[in-house]
Amino acid sequence: MASAAEWILFVDDDNELYSDYIINGLRVIRGYPKVGCFGGKLLLPDSIKPPKWTYPFFPFLAIRDFGDERIERVSDHWGPWEPPAAGAFIHRDVLQEYLRRTNSSDKIFKMGRAPGRLLNCEDSLIMLGASKVGRSNAYEPTLKLKHHLAPDRFRFSYLVRFMYGNGRSRVMLDAFSDMPPTVPDFYKANYKFFALILYTLWTERNMPIQYVIGKIAYRFGIKHQLLLKQPDQK
């Protein structure tokens, strides 16, 4: 269905908006005319109590709280200013830029999730388009929603596969976003990659072992996708 609106609010079926979410979003739109995409705090409801070892995974699962200071930036790189699609207000200009990209290559649609494939870089590609049209991304702490994640998303087996998919997604995002590659060259040489794994084990030694394994899975996801040479390949 076509829309003439300048803004669209994305709400997933597991999102519960606070009662003032839309009102505060409209205030942001009026107060910051150059913003292109923005979102806020995505919080777990009190009824969901995952084990503590899952906490380092929260940013990857769209559970985020960067504090009470507003953050805004025009950037073609990821940062706390870039909202996930869940609960995001997105300007028409940004969506038109995404449409332009999809018209140039339908391979972009393979960047999203599909049965048996935990890829998840569609959101980032949309948000990175803001800088292409001269608009910013913003973290707006006045916006709050509860993210009712399914319990199976906190399972170790799922999180390892999810992090592996995140690694693959990073390579695909570079390929489709017109950005300079962000994947370092040491992924391409086996001996350097082995050194990277050892470095990961050392730097993450104080983190839960489940998270360390997840980070290593992320590294292998990057390595795998680079070896495929075709960013859209399974």
At which residue positions do the language-model features occur?
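Conserved nucleotide-sugar donor-binding
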Residues: 4-5, 84-100
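The conserved acidic donor/metal-binding loop of glycosyltransferases
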Residues: 12-16
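Non-catalytic, C-terminal membrane-associated alpha-helical segments of glycosyltransferases
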Residues: 161-165, 178-234
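Acidic donor-binding loop at a coil-to-helix junction in glycosyltransferase catalytic cores
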Residues: 107-126
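Conserved donor NDP-sugar-binding/catalytic core segment of glycosyltransferases
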Residues: 20-54
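Short, flexible, basic/aromatic active-site loop/helix in glycosyltransferases
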Residues: 58-80
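Catalytic beta-strand/loop signature of glycosyltransferases that borders the donor
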Residues: 102, 108, 138-145
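Short aromatic/hydrophobic "clamp" motif used to bind/position activated sugar donors
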Residues: 8
